[in-house]
């Protein structure tokens, strides 16, 4: 990593959180002169919002050079797909973890802008510069593209199951122990600590938890959850690592992934691990 004084920080130039955003994706891309794109979507996304999304793209004259359903995150498949892709201005990922990881790693390989359009807010991965890929049969976290743009349509988010909301809350809770672990590592001289990044991570907690209402079905809460997860992703980009958002609670979750026949959602596991650590 370069010296902190010379570190280049990539932040989203395009950030839209609100209602009716899917139909405006075409306009957002046109405004940035991203006229040729590759579109990577998760299973079921075409049926969920595909019609609205494609209509908006066509209306603005955006050409979709490739449309791909990302059913896996095998690194060999992504690499082959990336280097067989005709020239495009941007990579657009729509859906959950697999689609976004497929898209952001493709953008990383080709060094072109990545637009992240999550259809659920179950963790902060949609705003981070890391991807969870399958390498030699095992899931590993690798460096990927930081989002040039993030578009979150609350009209889509509100239709996701409750478990996705709880997972997002759990992922946010994990910042509590992650930040404590980071400070402990700093105090023992093991790791570099970035004050501004830590402040951003603490602020991401404040956005969500300093609220008067915790009704997960309210638009206000969902907007706050989306915003806090976005800020958490930015905190990681500033730090140059996942330390502001990932600590020992994530190691517990990774262990559960290995030993459980049917692991739960990532945010659920890290949330439970955080609660256990706090009360240990």
Roles of regions detected by a PLM:
Residues 109-205:
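A glycine/threonine-rich phosphate-anchoring loop and its flanking beta-alpha core
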Residues 198-280:
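Active-site segments that bind and position negatively charged phosphate/pyrophosphate groups
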Residues 38, 89-92, 113-115, 148-150, ...:
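Structural motif
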Residues 7-8, 32, 83-86, 107, ...:
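Solvent-exposed alpha-helices and their adjacent loops that cap or buttress functional pockets
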Residues 85-106, 110-121:
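A short, small-residue-rich loop immediately preceding and capping a beta-strand
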Residues 43-48, 95-100, 122, 242:
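Gly/Ser/Thr-rich loops at beta-strand to alpha-helix junctions
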Residues 1-90:
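ATP/NTP phosphate-donor binding region
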């Amino acid at each position: 990593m370069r010296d902190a004084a010379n570190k280049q920080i990539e932040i989203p130039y395009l950030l839209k959180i609100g209602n009716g955003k899917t139909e405006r994706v075409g306009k957002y891309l046109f405004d940035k002169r991203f006229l040729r794109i590759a579109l990577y979507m998760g299973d079921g996304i075409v049926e969920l919002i595909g019609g609205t999304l494609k209509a908006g793209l066509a209306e603005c004259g955006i050409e979709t050079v490739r449309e791909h359903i990302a059913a896996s995150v095998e690194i060999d498949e992504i690499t082959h797909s990336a280097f067989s892709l005709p020239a495009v201005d941007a990579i657009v990922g729509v859906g959950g973890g697999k689609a976004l990881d497929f898209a952001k790693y493709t953008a990383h390989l080709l060094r072109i802008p990545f637009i992240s359009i999550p259809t659920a807010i179950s963790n902060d991965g949609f705003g981070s510069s890391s991807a969870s890929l399958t390498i030699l049969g095992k899931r590993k976290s690798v460096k990927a593209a930081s989002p040039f743009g993030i578009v979150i349509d609350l009209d889509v988010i509100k239709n996701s199951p409750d478990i996705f909301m709880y997972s997002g809350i759990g992922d946010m809770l994990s910042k509590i122990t992650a930040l404590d672990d980071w400070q402990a590592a700093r105090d023992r001289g093991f790791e570099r600590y970035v004050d501004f990044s830590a402040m951003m991570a603490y602020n991401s907690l404040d956005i969500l938890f300093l609220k008067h209402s915790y009704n997960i079905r309210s638009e206000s809460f969902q907007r706050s959850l989306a915003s806090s997860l976005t800020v958490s992703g930015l905190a990681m980009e500033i730090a140059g690592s996942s330390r502001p958002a990932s600590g020992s609670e994530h190691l517990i979750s990774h262990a559960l992934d290995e030993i459980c026949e049917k692991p739960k959602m990532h945010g659920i596991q890290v949330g439970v691990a955080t609660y256990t650590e706090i009360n240990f």
